[in-house]
Structures are given as structure tokens and as C-alpha cells.
Amino acid sequence: MARPKLWPWGILLLVSLLSAGFNLDTMNVCPSLDIRSEVAELRRLENCSVVEGHLQILLMFTATGEDFRSLSFPHLTQVTDYLLLFRVYGLESLRDLFPNLAVIRGAHLFLGYALVIFEMPHLRDVGLPALGAVLHGSVRVEKNQELCHLSTIDWGLLQPTPSTNYIVGNKLGEECADVCPGTLGAAGEPCARTTFNGHTDYRCWTSSHCQRVCPCPQGLACTISGECCHTECLGGCSQPEDPRACVACRHFYYQSACHRACPLGTYEHESWRCVTAESCANLRSVPGRASTFGIHQGKCLAQCPPGFTRNGSSIFCHKCEGLCPKECKVGTKTIDSVQAAQDLVGCTHVEGSLILNLRRGYNLEPELQRSLGLVETITGFLKIKHSFALVSLSFFKNLKLIRGDTMVDGNYTLYVLDNQNLQQLGPWVSAGLTIPVGKIYFAFNPRLCLEHIYRLEEVTGTRGRQNKAEINPRTNGDRAACQTRTLRFVSNVTEADRILLRWERYEPLEARDLLSFIVYYKESPFQNATEHVGPDACGSQSWNLLDVELPLSRTQEPGVILAPLKPWTQYAVFVRAITLTTAEDSPHQGAQSPIVYLWTLPAAPTVPQDVISSSNSSSHLLVRWKPPTQRNGNITYYLVLWQRLAEDGDLYLNDYCHRGLRLPTSNHDPRFDREDGDLEAELELGCCPCQHAPPGQVLPALEAQEASFQKKFENFLHNAITIPKPPWKVTSIHRNLQRDAGRHRRAIGSPRPGGNSSDFEIQEDKVPRERAVLGGLRHFTEYRIDIHACNHAAHIVGCSAATFVFARTMPRREADDIPGKLSWEAASKSSVLLRWFEPPDPNGLILKYEIKYRRLGEEATVLCVSRLRYAKVGGVQLALLPPGNYSARVRATSLAGNGSWTDSVAFYIPGPEEEDSGGLHILLTVTPAGLMLLIILAALGFFYSRKRNGTLYTSVNPEYLSASDMYIPDEWEVPREQISIIRELGQGSFGMVYEGVAKGLEAGEESTPVALKTVNELASPRERIEFLKEASVMKAFQCHHVVRLLGVVSQGQPTLVIMELMTRGDLKSHLRSLRPEAENNPGIPRPALGDMIQMAGEIADGMAYLAANKFVHRDLAARNCMVSQDFTVKIGDFGMTRDVYETDYYRKGGKGLLPVRWMAPESLKDGIFTTHSDVWSFGVVLWEIVTLAEQPYQGLSNEQVLKFVMDGGVLEELEDCPHQLQELMSSCWQQNPRLRPTFTQILNSIQKELRPSFRLLSFYHSPECQGGCGLQPTTDAESSSPPTSKGASDCSLQNGGPEH
């Protein structure tokens, strides 16, 4: 079967798993982990195999790359909820930290995301080579300025629905060197290619770790060798088809094995493992508390679902009869929000007491009814105080009993105090509420009518238990003003987030009339607050209230701490005494303080917002931002620090002559053109935005979702960032500026991955406004800019943490110009070496050079030279130039684009006659010393020649061509001056191959397009012999489906072999260009069955001709077949593409390169090459045609292919392959060579489906073969006989020839 190529990640994964001792038997489950501030905290992950919950790693500002190099947690294979990384400095990749993390289950998500990587300043790649599945949730990768290798990840291999991923704000793809293993010069074999979001590419996590692509159906995992795991495995396995060898489980894990469903007697827990009933009973939601877990419908749940309950003797959840009894032990629970009430959803029996203190909210009754509507019994007391948001108590629609096991102050079972808007007691009267013991107490409910209270007395049976003071007519249902006494504050102490207040003790006439104090406070920018404490126009309370109990000592002054408060904010505060009077004829007595205004102390501001940058010149950057959301003082200045960043040196690894070049930009931001002023609309004075959306108006779903996530995420960041100490807090700008700058340099000056940014100086400036102009910068250079907000107390509290932005200056126009003049020197008789100096201070990096040269009277030729190629000789060599006058010029291309062309330089290539006369002139004018030198050189040459002639060269076909290094020109010789070179086509097996034009080569044609093969000038004698041998072989071939030799230029250097020009290149490249996702797709549809059979017929015809000429090809493959302009396929020129596709060959035992993936088993075993073995290779070529040139035996190394084929293996049958072609392939791959068809038999089977032009042009239908002769299988030995010059010799040979 065909197996995908699995990069050595598989071996590394296996080694790491073995070294980690991975086994399902040794699984260690850890709870959710929040790791922050210190790298040492990561040690909590040691020995964790599974994190049952979430894993958060965040806010490590002082960490460096060195801190992480010794850390690795190979045991960790899965996280059941989500993985979040945020602002971890120094961490460059996760590949060493979590080398075996295979699964993120996403059982509970972070705002819909299972993987969040946010603002990781030094992260260069995600690097999770073992990750095979993200079961639920999306991926969010945002604002990671160094993060690359995102375009090479196929998220579709990991997620069921990757379309909701959010990957923005990372390093631009054109600035990344996203090179996968085995491509563009990277080490190793190529990774698998897949199509994701319409783009086909190699898939890898890093430049040395491929992404796993398993060949298994339905997304099954696989072993490192590509064998399919058990269907219940997830993320990989160590043995195929073994549920105990899984890295993680697709469904459930129990007793060291994976199961589709939990075994009998066990129950699902957290959607990934099975537990017994005993284990479920021992689980705790909160350590130290009683277990609330119950078993329902085969699942172990933290609580029984609504409508079900668990009794004391069983862990199983039972359906309730009627209203479901659910006992909730709460102790004394305060409900001060809707969220707090939700803890009682479904409760019918509250064992404990409830205190309602709902001061804020809008239309709370429906929400409270969902939470408290089923409550029937409260065993303790019910206390409702200061609940200004309540209008009715109807949400207690089923409340029947308040038992009074515990009471307020030992007396009161129902206690209703100071509820300014309470008007109705709800259904208590009609439902028959019972209060068997204790009193009821109502006070300071000005909107609650007394008749409701008196009626409640009768229903509950409490009439006569309480006195008139406990249901006071003066404070219930009465909004009349009372006589008050002024309370005075005696002290206050303010801090940044709190105020400590004390006031004088109030002594009413009757001490028992004083109940408590209420402190009212609110933000008040202006000193115009009123004492009105009712709801405001938005339905919420404008004042914050704090209930203060009376001090125990009669001499102690009452006081309170108001917290948490906002720094540097003015608050209005007053205090009121809650009193009553027992004397009916006495006026109501009270006490209240005047409103006082207090300022909290300043604190460090939050970070500046919405930083934008732009460049308007090559030496300046403009930066603008908005003030921090919380200034916490008067902003006096902003501290701006900036540092130059090094360019990514990995860009030099790319050959931009062959790879598309997309350059970074430094465009001007149009937002800088706006006028100054607030960009946000001011709210109308005196109005406030209500917290509920206007009826009928909703945000668009996408915008609402995005806005919601951003808001929640920023709230999370704000809460999280206040916990650790800031990484470099400016504690004293004036006295300790130098110390703080040094701390800052350590923070932002950490070496940037791939560069040496720490070598560049950090600049700083203080600016009074929300903008800065940074000058004196280097052209087209990226800078990191950090901005801190500092208020008037910065010398005490420090400045804010930094917000940062990256910006690039504009290019300098002349920076990429090449200095000085272009120089040249003769490298040989037909080549020159052009040299020039690099631009000394370019815009970023120089990526390539372009040379434009032209011969006098001809069109110019443009040659691209990569910087790596330039660096070898400081220029470039122009070879194979016909004689004549030339001019050349050059320009550089940097990250900013093209520089200017240099001035042209002229040079001259002499002709053969001039070379001869020049040599004679030298001989006639040399000095005696020169003559002596020539004599010595001649002697050395003589001895060298004697030695060379004594060397014996072996030939694969020793009788076919003499190994002599002499070449005798014949009728094939073409004068060199008739040849013109146009451009490079590629590298051949002996040297460069060019496209050119030959004049007068063919009768009736003025010029003929040709391909020119060369031999390297430094080639060895052996290589020159082989080069001439190949030319001599081609002279004998005259077949339409074999590439023709047109001539030889053997006089002078270098030697040229002139071939028929095949404009569409080799068949392998042509087939790959027909893939729909190919970037160079010519717009031609995928070959139909008829097209594929036509290609097969043309190749078979060319091979039949070679077989008739007793020639064994030995390297038949799509790469060695050529495609002409009219799409005719011809057998190539035997070796031209070997260097181009070097990875298709394998060196066995130190011998020559072998195309093992195309070779027959007898060739691999015994080195036998016959026409039969060529037929085997023809079958592989058919497979290439059907798959559009996929690599045969994909997924197997060359060594594995060698063993696989020698053991009788063949390529797997292809899906959707035409039956006719599949049968033809199978016949070519018979293990017995004699059972394979000959090429003429192949043509016999398909000739009816070939186009009519085939009959006119083919060898098969030629007179020499007389319409399909039977050809004798040619052995490698027979192929040594030279073919005749007339083409095919004897076509009447019979099959069954000799075989090695």
C-alpha cells in the first residue's frame, strides 16, 4: 500500500514517549492549572499526563529563553478543557515544553476557544509536533509579532470545523522564512502536502518538524510507520489496532485501555474517562467539602440535573414525584446578585438561612423566580434588607414554611428591613406561608403598606408575638419626614483604593431605638450630590450602600472601610442612623451626616490604549495613542522608549529568484491625517447609558460576538495583569531613572529570535501629549516602541505597564544603489565574471540581484542572482556567450524593493579566429623566460597526458562506446557562432541547460529554437567522456517520440550538445502544474482518460523504438520524459534531470545514485537491467500520470522502498483510477519479468484509443516496424551494441530473448 511520508518527528515522538515512560497504566491526572509570574511555577506540571481542566500559562515578564531550555514535560499528552498562553517572555517555541501534547479536548472553552496564544512577544513557532486533535472549540492566535509557521499548519487535520479560527496580527507571512523540512534547501525529506483553505503546501510545525498526516480512513490516528491505530485511539499509538497502545482516547479511557462506551458498572466522567460508583462518590468539586456528585444516565455529574435528586443512601439521581425535592445545605447564604441566586436553582428545601441584599439590578424578578421559585422550605430565617431593586417578593411563589431553627438576633424568623421600593409580598398570603416559631420584623419599608404586613401576621400565625415597635407604623408605608440630628465625622484616612471613616456615636432617647447605620457613597466628580437615594432614571441605584452594625462597646465610635474604590477619584459620602421609636406620641427621631467629599490617593495608570504608528520619511516615525482607561491621577507625561530590531537572518535562506517575493511595507496610516480631538462621541450631559439594549435594536451577530469576546478578554487581562508585579516599574523617574532604564532594557531588550536586537541601544523620551515623533532613525528598519503613562504621583507609585507597537521607517531612495562601477574579467574564452560591491547600508536586507546584459544588435537578457550565489564570488559568471560586443548593468533588490541600475559596462567576447591569432602573437612576442616556462609546462603536460592515458575507465555498456577521451568531429558538428543563448532552463546531469537559438541548423529554417546542454568547465575527464558518450548515443536515434539530437559544438570550450527544445519541460513538472491548487497552473483541465492513454502510448512508442535498437533505458520516469509545445510526450535525453530531482535517487552502499522507487525487483536484487525492467518502470510512470506526479511509495524511506519491492510489494491500487490503466499497471508489475508485456504488446492493447496523428508519426506504425512487430526483450548487455544510424534495425525479432 502507499504510505505517507512521516518525517522523523515520528521517531522523535517515539523516543520521547519511551524516555518519558508513557503508558496508559501510569496516567497521572492533574486538575486545572493557572501558572503565572515565575518560570519555576511550571514545575507543577511534572508527572502530569492529563490536565483535567484548563492550562493557563501567563504573565512571565522577566523570563528569558535560557529559563525554558531545561524545561520539558513529555508526560503531558492531553488537556481536557483549553490551553491559554499570554505574555510569556522568552518562550520561543512549545516543541520542547510539550513535545507529546497530542489532544486538546475542549470540554469547557475559553470564550469559545480551545487554544489561545495571545501577545507572546518572543514565540517564533507553535511547535506542537505531536498535536493530532482539537476536538471542540476554535483556535485564536493573535498579536504575536514574531510568530511564523502558521501558514504551514493544516488546522483541518486537527479540528472538525477550523473555519471559525481567528489568526490575525502575527508576523507577516512574507517576512517569515516558512520552510518545511526537505524544501528550498532545508534538511530532510519533504513533509506531506495537503490543501487547506484552497492552498496546497507542505505541512509542518517548524523547519525541522513535519505535521502528521496519516493515510488512514476517517481521520484515524497512525503509528510512526504509517500503520493505522485502533479506531478508539486519538493522537497516535505505539502499536496498530491495539486499544491499549493509544496516546489518548477518542471516547473514554478505563483501566489502561480506550473504549467507545464505558464498561458495565462504570460511568462517564468529564467526557473522557470512566469511573466506578465508588470513585464518583469520592470526587469533590471543591477540596474539603462534601461530595455533591451523582450518577445520572450513565454519567458521573457534579450535581443531579433539575427534576432529579439524590437521597442520602444512594449516589444515583432519582426522578422526583411531582415537584422535585432538592435539599441544599447553605448555612447562611447572602444573595446579592442574580449570579449568587443561581446557586439555588432547583432547590426546594433550603437547609440554612437566606439573606437577600439586592441593591442593584433591573427587572430581576424573572431571573430570581428561575432560581428561587421552587423553594418550599427554609429551615432558618429569611432576612431581606437594603434590597432597593426589589418591588415584589412574588418570586418566592412556592414558599410555604420558614421553620426558624435559627433566628435573627435570636428573635426574628422573617426580617424585612430598609427596602425602599418593596411594595408587594407576593403570593405568601394566598399560599399559606407558615412561621411556627419566632417573630416577624418590618421596618423602613416606606412603600410597603401596613395592611399587607398585618395580613401576613394572620396567615403565618405570628399575630401577638411581636410588639408595635417590630412592625412600626412610622417606618412602613410612611414617606413623611422625621426629625433628625446631625452626625459628624470625626476622622477619615484615604488610600488609593479605600477610605476609612469614623463618626460620632449617636445616642437616641431610647438606646434600643438605634438599630444600625447605613453609609451612602458614590463617585462625584462635582460637589453637587443630593441625598436622594432612590433609583435613578436608568432603574439602578445611584448611591452605594454599606450596612454598619453598632459597635459592641458603648464608648467606641462607629466606623467603616469603603472598598474597593477607584484611585484618584472624588467620592461623596454621608451616613444615616436607622432608628425607630416605641412611643406612639413621640415624633420620629433620626440622625444623618451632611455630605462630605473625599479624594482617594493616586495609583499607577493602566496602559495607554490604541497605539498606532506611521512613517512619513526614512528617518522618522510618528506614534499616536489614546490615554489609559484609568488614569488614577493627573497624567503629566508619557515615557516613550524605542529600540531598533534586527532583521530576520533566515530570509537569506530563501532563493527569491525562484520564490515569490512579497515585501514588508511602511505605509502611511491615514488615521494620522485626522484633526486632533476626541474620536469618541461625548454623552449628553446629565444622561447615562442604560444597561439594557433598546427594544428592536441588536448588533450584527458577527460584530456582537467579536465585541463580546474583545470586551471579556480585555477584562480578563485587566484582572490578571494586576496580580503579578510589573516587569519594570518606574518607581522614581528623577532619582532612579538610570536604574529603571536598565530594568527596562532587560525587559524589552531580550534578544529577538533570529537576530541580535540586544546589541542596539534603547532610546527614550518624555512627551506631554498622546503623540510622539521619533527622529534620527535608520531607514527601512523595524523598531519596537514602548509607551508608559505617568501621572503626577509617578515618583511614588510609578508609571503604567507598557503597551507596545512595531513600526518600520520608510526606505531611503538611494540606499539600495550599488556603489562604484561594475567590473568584469574574462573567466574563459566564452564567459566573463562580473563583479560589484554590495550596497553598504541597504534598506533592510539585500535579497537578490538582477543583471541585464545584451549583445550588440540583440534583445537584452535578464539574469537573477540570489544573494547566496553572489556571496560565493562577489558577482556572477556569464557563460556560453557567443562572440561579440556586450554591455551589462546590475541592480539590487532589498526588502524595500529594487535599487537603481548601475552604469553599463562594455566587454568583448573574441571569436575563434581572433583567439588563434592572439595565441600566435603571444608565441612570437614572449621573452626567453616565457619560453622556458612554456617548455616546462609542455613537459608537465606530456607526463600528465601519459598518466591520463594509462587510466582505465569502466563503462556500464563497455562494448557500446569506447571510453577514449578523444572526440572526432563529424557531420553533427555545428559552428559555435551559429548558436545564441537566451536563458537558463535548469541544471542537468553534466552542467547547465540553456534555451537558445541555432541558425541554419535545419533546411528551410533560418533559426531553430533549441536546448543547449553544457559540461562544467571544471568537469573531470570521466565526466567529459560520459557527456560525449550521451551525445553519441543520441546520434543514432531518429524517432518522433524520443528527444532528438540536433548537433554538437566540440570545438572550443565549453562543449555544447544541441537538443530538440521541449518548451513545456519535463513530464513530472507538467503534471504537477495541472493540479487545481498549483500556483503555476496554465489553466488546462486535469487530463481525461483519453489524454492519459495518449501519454502512455507516446512513451511506450519511444521505449519500443529503444528496445528495437537494443537499448535499455534504466531510468524511465516522468522526470525523464519531456513535453513539447503541442503536448507530445517524448523519452528524454537520459540524465538531464538527475540533478534537478536528486531526491528521487538513492545511493546504495556507496555506489551511484539509483532510482529505487522506479526500479524492478530483479534490478534491485541482482543489478539486472532489461527491457522487462523498463516495462516495470513504465508501470510506475502510468501511476505518476494518474496521480499527477505524486511520489511513489509516499511515506516510505528509500531503504523501506528497497525492502518493500524486493519482498514482492507493489504500489497500492488507486481510487477512481480507470480500470484499463489499473490493469495495465498490474501487468507491468508482475514479479516474473517474462510475464510482463513488451512495449509493442502494450501498444497493441491501446492502439485503438490513440489519436489518428499517432499512426502517422509513431515508430510502432512505421515501415521499419511494419505496424506492430514483436520485439525481443533487450538485456543490459545487448544494449551495448551500437544502434544503426538509420533508426530501428530489425523489427522482426521475437519475444523471449536472453535475460540476466
UniProtKB/Swiss-Prot annotation:
Q: Tell me its EC number(s), please.
A: 2.7.10.1
Give the span(s) annotated as Disordered.
740-762, 1270-1300
Question: TM segments?
Answer: 922-943
Which residue intervals define the domain Fibronectin type-III in the entry? 483-603, 607-707, 818-912
Q: Which residues bind ATP?
A: L985, G986, Q987, G988, S989, F990, G991, M992, V993, K1013
Q: Which SUPFAM superfamilies match?
A: Fibronectin type III (SSF49265), Growth factor receptor domain (SSF57184), L domain-like (SSF52058), Protein kinase-like (PK-like) (SSF56112)
Q: Which residues are modified by glycosylation?
A: N47, N311, N411, N492, N528, N616, N634, N756, N885, N898
**Mind listing the GO biological process terms from this record?**
actin cytoskeleton organization; cellular response to alkaline pH; male sex determination; protein autophosphorylation
Which residue intervals are annotated with compositional bias (Polar residues) in the record? Answer: 1272-1300
Function per UniProt:
Receptor with tyrosine-protein kinase activity. Functions as a pH sensing receptor which is activated by increased extracellular pH. Activates an intracellular signaling pathway that involves IRS1 and AKT1/PKB.
Subunit: Probable tetramer of 2 alpha and 2 beta chains linked by disulfide bonds. The alpha chains contribute to the formation of the ligand-binding domain, while the beta chains carry the kinase domain.
* Domain notes from UniProt: The extracellular domain is required for sensing alterations in external pH.
The protein's name is Insulin receptor-related protein
Which gene name belongs to this protein? INSRR
